[in-house]
Curated annotation (Swiss-Prot):
Family statement drawn from the similarity comment of this UniProt entry: Belongs to the ATPase protein 8 family.
Gene Ontology annotations for the cellular component aspect, listed alphabetically: mitochondrial membrane; proton-transporting ATP synthase complex
One Gene Ontology term of the molecular function aspect: proton transmembrane transporter activity
Compartments where found: Mitochondrion membrane
Organism: Pelomedusa subrufa (African side-necked turtle)
Subunit structure: Component of the ATP synthase complex composed at least of ATP5F1A/subunit alpha, ATP5F1B/subunit beta, ATP5MC1/subunit c (homooctomer), MT-ATP6/subunit a, MT-ATP8/subunit 8, ATP5ME/subunit e, ATP5MF/subunit f, ATP5MG/subunit g, ATP5MK/subunit k, ATP5MJ/subunit j, ATP5F1C/subunit gamma, ATP5F1D/subunit delta, ATP5F1E/subunit epsilon, ATP5PF/subunit F6, ATP5PB/subunit b, ATP5PD/subunit d, ATP5PO/subunit OSCP.
Pfam families reported in the protein's UniProt record: ATP-synt_8
Source species taxonomy: Eukaryota, Metazoa, Chordata, Craniata, Vertebrata
Name this protein carries in UniProt: ATP synthase F(0) complex subunit 8
Membrane topology: Single-pass membrane protein
Domain of life of the source: Eukaryota
Amino acid sequence: MPQLNPHPWFSIFITSWLILIIILLPKIKSHIPNNSPTNKKNMLTTPMPWTWPWT
């Protein structure tokens, strides 16, 4: 039985995964919420209004 050279299969496998990641990465990033520190800092500095339960 002849021995197969694994090199082209590794390159095909890696290339296909890279193409898949490049295509899917913007779609995945659009679903992840943005965790930039400026937004968190702005949210911490602005006071949140409190609605009192007895009013």
